[in-house]
Amino acid sequence: MASNWQVQQAARVVCEGGVIAYPTEAVWGLGCDPWNEVAVDRLLALKERPVHKGLILVADDIEQFDFLLDDLPAIWQERLAASWPGPNTWLVPHQDRLPAWITGVHDSVALRVSDHPLVRALCRLTGPLISTSANPAGRPAARSRLRVEQYFPRQLDKVLGGALGGRKNPSLIRDLRTGDVIRSS
């Protein structure tokens, strides 16, 4: 695992508008400050991902998403709390509380509270992060630091070393309103 100093350095890069790569539960991720439109635009350009698709926000704790969850029905809040931290991403109504560069054309946003210690340590310092697989569109998700560096040679502001979490597949994605599975794990 990365040292506390390395995590602090990565957090500083994020807070200064940088784009980083880091290991997650199953694949390497790219991340940046979700409130920094320039950083998000750069991340999307690196991935060759259109903004209309939207992005995932990852956090250390459910409380980091309180500004989105406070007005939701109690049953939905209980469903989220029971599944986090863990490999569960939920599509949650954003109630126009997030910019379009995060949500794309959707009325919901993808949220996950990670159980990966490195992701959690990073989010404790930065707050929620954009989290998307570290790969250009149409290519397999990176499962090693070497692959990240091959995909994005000298294009990232920081690559935070560490091990993947051991899961074979990316997180399950479900719609909070319906319970429907959008992507199985």
Curated annotation (Swiss-Prot):
Limits of the YrdC-like domain: 4-185
Entry-linked Gene3D superfamilies: DHBP synthase
Residues spanning the signal sequence: none
Molecular function per GO: ATP binding; double-stranded RNA binding; L-threonylcarbamoyladenylate synthase; tRNA binding
Subcellular location(s) of the protein: Cytoplasm
GO cellular component, one term: cytoplasm
Entry-linked InterPro entries: DHBP_synth_RibB-like_a/b_dom, Sua5-like_dom, TC-AMP_synthase, TC-AMP_synthase_SUA5
Keyword annotations: ATP-binding, Cytoplasm, Nucleotide-binding, Nucleotidyltransferase, Transferase, tRNA processing
The organism's place on the tree of life at top rank: Bacteria
Pfam families attached to this UniProt entry: Sua5_yciO_yrdC (PF01300)
GO terms classed as biological process: regulation of translational fidelity; tRNA threonylcarbamoyladenosine modification
EC number: 2.7.7.87
Catalytic activity: L-threonine + hydrogencarbonate + ATP = L-threonylcarbamoyladenylate + diphosphate + H2O
SUPFAM superfamilies: YrdC/RibB
Record-linked HAMAP family: TsaC
Family the UniProt entry places it in: Belongs to the SUA5 family. TsaC subfamily.
Function: Required for the formation of a threonylcarbamoyl group on adenosine at position 37 (t(6)A37) in tRNAs that read codons beginning with adenine. Catalyzes the conversion of L-threonine, HCO(3)(-)/CO(2) and ATP to give threonylcarbamoyl-AMP (TC-AMP) as the acyladenylate intermediate, with the release of diphosphate.
Name recorded for this polypeptide: Threonylcarbamoyl-AMP synthase
Organism: Ectopseudomonas mendocina (strain ymp)
